[in-house]
């Protein structure tokens, strides 16, 4: 037996007696060993032997529960609790239970919000996405301008293809604008300043800043 284990065994009676009195609930020797082994380094044989000795000395109570021995503090050492005191304790338990449930619900809400924010684009990613969309839109505007300027040289099939692509990209425009709006709204929920200040700080420019409106479908 190591020196630390020997010292723990020597003080086992005091440790176990104090533990049962503080917890004031029934335990098997296995429960006591599992709960105290890491903190005090008590071996299982020491725990079993010490509990039996404490029971024989009348310092704790022992009771058979099936094939297992259960140990608990002698209840005679505790003051009697009146019905009024029990009602007060019950009230505190109800209040604390409600508080715990409220805190758990708040934790679930914050975890869900954190998960949503973690999956959103970062500010640099949003800025990059916006620049790419601007570049893409500028290319389509230039292409459409050239097509309109050369109307007499466009076949009906080419014209139909262009308008189909226009509808496609307008739809994508709306989709991406909606996504960008939702992401910025999510960020603004925890942002201490106004939406306008946020856009100015990160360099976000909107369609409205340039009086650009989405074409009709």
UniProtKB/Swiss-Prot annotation:
Top-rank taxon, per record: Eukaryota
Subunit structure: Interacts with the DNA-binding domain of the nuclear receptors NR3C1/GR, ESR2/ER-beta, THRB and RXRA. Forms a stable heterodimer with MND1. Interacts with PSMC3/TBP1.
Tissue specificity note: Highly expressed in testis and colon.
Record's disease association: Ovarian dysgenesis 3: A disorder characterized by lack of spontaneous pubertal development, primary amenorrhea, uterine hypoplasia, and hypergonadotropic hypogonadism as a result of streak gonads.
Post-translational modification: PTM: Phosphorylated by PKA, PKC and MAPK.
Protein name: Homologous-pairing protein 2 homolog
Gene3D superfamilies found in the cross-reference section: Winged helix-like DNA-binding domain superfamily/Winged helix DNA-binding domain
Entry GO MF terms: double-stranded DNA binding; recombinase activator activity; transcription coactivator activity
Keyword Iron: no
Organism the protein comes from: Homo sapiens
Function: Plays an important role in meiotic recombination. Stimulates DMC1-mediated strand exchange required for pairing homologous chromosomes during meiosis. The complex PSMC3IP/MND1 binds DNA, stimulates the recombinase activity of DMC1 as well as DMC1 D-loop formation from double-strand DNA. This complex stabilizes presynaptic RAD51 and DMC1 filaments formed on single strand DNA to capture double-strand DNA. This complex stimulates both synaptic and presynaptic critical steps in RAD51 and DMC1-promoted homologous pairing.
Induction (UniProt): Overexpressed in leiomyomas compared to myometrium.
Coiled-coil segments on the chain, per record: 93-153
Protein family (similarity comment): Belongs to the HOP2 family.
GO cellular component, one term: nucleoplasm
Keywords: Coiled coil, Disease variant, DNA recombination, DNA-binding, Meiosis, Nucleus, Phosphoprotein
Classification via InterPro entries: Hop2_WH_dom (IPR010776), LZ3wCH (IPR040661), WH-like_DNA-bd_sf (IPR036388)
Annotated compartments: Nucleus
Residues covered by region (DNA-binding): 118-182
Pfam annotation, one family: TBPIP
A GO biological process held by the record: homologous chromosome pairing at meiosis
